[in-house]
């Protein structure tokens, strides 16, 4: 499951980056290796603003306050339904994911 979420986050990041000079990411601390983040910036020329959280409560507080400005957020399932119901996230538009063919159907 962690690999699926990581793959989805990376593909969403790449799709978001395709139209941006900067991508803002909010993720669990130690979830993506800093070397991978640096490699992404180097290969794409896109600046990453990479903020981390260490608890579901911190994530939820920021997301439910609204206007976080993040392009990619990596939540966990524990609080996810409440955050979705509150409108904290936008639905992904598959037509804007050019690398969707590389994603699992699950």
Please name every model-derived segment.
Residues 81-106:
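Hinge/lid segment of periplasmic solute-binding proteins
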Residues 21-83:
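Early extracytoplasmic/lumenal segment of secretory-pathway proteins
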Residues 6-8, 31, 72-73, 106:
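Short amphipathic alpha-helical surface micro-motifs
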Residues 7-15:
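Bacterial N-terminal signal peptides
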Residues 16-20:
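Sec/Tat signal peptide C-region and signal peptidase I cleavage site
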Residues 1-4:
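Positively charged n-region of N-terminal signal peptides that target proteins for export
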